[in-house]
């Protein structure tokens, strides 16, 4: 695989993802620039898979910055919800987003909106749990996180890697670590949620860490 060089764009505006990805890349000694630092726009995610969207974001950032760019597309897939929210995990946290195929009452049109009108994962977790409850006790609480990681170069070359971690959902959410749906997810073999375990422990087992290990192995 091609080398990255001394600088890399991390194609995300999510501060939690940016921090975690910088920590995972630290051993490589590469200067990591966030998309916001370069004033790069967030492209519309039009793909139908996690890899589709991660490649779209990586290519867009590489084209605009002239630097190699690394993008992540990740999400929570719940068995009882037939894989939802999946690639729309972030959208479930957006103000006014109507959950497709919702079985429970969806609330007011502005549900999910906080005072700043930004993504609210507290309410997104409530949405997920309501849907799981509406699916019935027999549906269970099994779920998994998926991370697709794509590295793109300005010449159009792109390499992608995927990681998954399986577990169960709990309610109410627990812990202040992590971000997104972490406080309601317990990985197999653990008693604490991703919101409770130490960041170093999460980095050892998470879907993102698995994808990063594949990336680092490919870089040699």
Put a short name on every predicted segment.
Residues 2-9, 15-220:
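Anionic-ligand binding patches
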């Amino acid at each position: 695989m091609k080398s990255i060089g001394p600088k890399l764009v991390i194609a995300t505006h999510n501060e939690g993802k940016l921090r975690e990805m910088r920590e995972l890349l630290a051993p490589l000694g590469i200067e990591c620039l966030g998309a916001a630092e370069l004033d790069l726009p967030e492209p519309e995610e039009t793909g139908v898979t996690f890899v589709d969207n991660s490649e779209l974001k990586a290519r867009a950032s590489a084209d605009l910055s002239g630097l190699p760019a690394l993008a992540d597309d990740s999400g929570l897939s719940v068995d009882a919800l037939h894989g939802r929210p999946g690639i729309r995990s972030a959208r479930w946290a957006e103000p006014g987003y109507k959950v497709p195929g919702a079985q429970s009452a969806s609330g007011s049109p502005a549900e999910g909106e906080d005072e700043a009108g930004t993504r609210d994962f507290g309410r997104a977790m409530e949405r997920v749990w309501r849907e799981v409850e509406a699916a019935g006790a027999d549906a269970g609480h099994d779920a998994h996180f998926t991370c697709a990681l794509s590295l793109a170069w300005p010449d159009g070359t792109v390499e992608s890697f995927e990681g998954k971690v399986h577990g169960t959902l709990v309610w109410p959410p627990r812990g202040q670590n992590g971000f997104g749906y972490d406080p309601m997810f317990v990985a197999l073999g653990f008693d604490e949620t991703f919101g409770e375990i130490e960041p170093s422990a999460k980095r050892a087992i998470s879907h993102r860490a698995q994808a990063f290990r594949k990336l680092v192995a490919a870089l040699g």
